[in-house]
Amino acid sequence: MIRALKANGTDQRVLNAMKKVPRHLFLPEDMQSFAYADTPLPIGYDQTISAPHMVAIMCDLLKITEGMTILEIGSGSGYNAAVMAELAGENGKVYTVERIPELVDLARNNLERAGYSNVTVVHDDGSCGLPEHAPYDRIAVTSVAPEVPPPLREQLSKNGIMVIPVGTQYQTLVVVKKDSKGNITHKAMGEVIFVPLIGKYGF
């Protein structure tokens, strides 16, 4: 898996972070034999764990550095949050929001078992963000929204970066940047396929 990602030009810091995260711990037992295949896999409740190449792409685009505060929308099984926690380091903080109670428990258990104490899993409507800990240096959204939710734009810090899939019939991965004056820019990075973001500002 790592060799393939390296061949695709993934940043070395991202590769190192992904090497450290035992992906099989974030999968159901009957899926663990496929843990290091470059494909999305079901984790229950009509949700998936993203393919490793997509995790790598999003982390590359986010440009996470040590000590950052990160918001993730869509915890799933906790894998993506673990990779970002590795990138943010022990002085960083990851908040990850999940709407499905069973996945909240799953992500918490997986992250605790894997030793990630700098990740907090919250049960809430992720399309509204998590205002109590804003602003965030980076925001990662792991489900597709019809448009960029206004609360997420507001909760992004100045000089912050958000990566989010956007679209209805067709989905595009979008990089949202906020400059030092608070101006917002959007850049489309290519077509993707994600599960829908359900919530007030989702579907």
From Swiss-Prot:
One of its GO terms (cellular component) is cytoplasm. It catalyses: [protein]-L-isoaspartate + S-adenosyl-L-methionine = [protein]-L-isoaspartate alpha-methyl ester + S-adenosyl-L-homocysteine. Its main location: cytoplasm. Pfam families: PCMT. Keywords: Cytoplasm, Methyltransferase, S-adenosyl-L-methionine, Transferase. The active site is at 50. Its EC number is 2.1.1.77. InterPro entries: PCMT, SAM-dependent_MTases_sf. The keyword Protein transport does not apply. It is found in: Cytoplasm. The keyword Cytoplasm applies. PROSITE patterns: PCMT (PS01279). It is an enzyme of class 2 (transferase). Gene3D superfamilies: Vaccinia Virus protein VP39 (3.40.50.150). One of its GO terms (biological process) is methylation. Catalyzes the methyl esterification of L-isoaspartyl residues in peptides and proteins that result from spontaneous decomposition of normal L-aspartyl and L-asparaginyl residues. It plays a role in the repair and/or degradation of damaged proteins. This is Protein-L-isoaspartate O-methyltransferase. It comes from Methanococcoides burtonii (strain DSM 6242 / NBRC 107633 / OCM 468 / ACE-M).
